[in-house]
Amino acid sequence: MKPAFCALALIPLLLAGCATPPSAQAPMSSAAEASAQTALDERISYYANAYDVPESLIHRSILRESGYNPTAHVGPYWGLMQIRLDTARSMGFRGSARDLLDADTNLKYAVAYLSNAYVVAGRNPDHAIRLYASGYFWEARRKGLLDRLRTAQADEPPAN
């Protein structure tokens, strides 16, 4: 029994050798990080204008949902704004769940959804964040706003 226990105790040590040492992992340079952040900010600005949502609200949602990690995947939630596949589909998305890990794709459908939450919330950012996280359908129905909800199917900015 002792030899088997000793062998089991060595497994974590052997597996530790398989890990890439931190020094071998190439960190992103500060210039590359700045460039990536600038590109992301440009896309956020684009979708904020396209869907009439404050950029600050989009940034707040991204920080809350993924901490600006476009490859975040927790349970049924995907990407930068942690949108569910079925929710993205309700906004017109036709791809696979993994496609939502692309930041631009994620923003296109998640900001459309956030835009609806913002309208239903009476343009109150705090309420919009809550509705984004919990869903807005029943409140939109109660307020008679279902006909004002939009999708992201068109490449053109939605009409108001």
For the regions a language model picked out, list residue spans one by one.
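Second-shell loop/turn segments in exported
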Residues: 29-34, 44-48, 69-77, 94-103, ...
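Solvent-exposed loop/turn segments at secondary-structure junctions
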Residues: 66-69, 87-89, 135-138
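Catalytic and binding regions of secreted/periplasmic enzymes and modules that target cell-wall glycans
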Residues: 111-150
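Bacterial Sec signal peptide processing site at the extreme N-terminus
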Residues: 12-36
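Short, functionally critical alpha-helical segments immediately adjacent to catalytic or ligand/cofactor-binding
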Residues: 53-68, 110, 129-133
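Export/targeting segments at the very N-terminus of extracytoplasmic proteins
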Residues: 28-63
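Substrate-binding/active-site groove segments that recognize
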Residues: 76-93
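Bacterial N-terminal signal peptides that target proteins for export
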Residues: 1-8
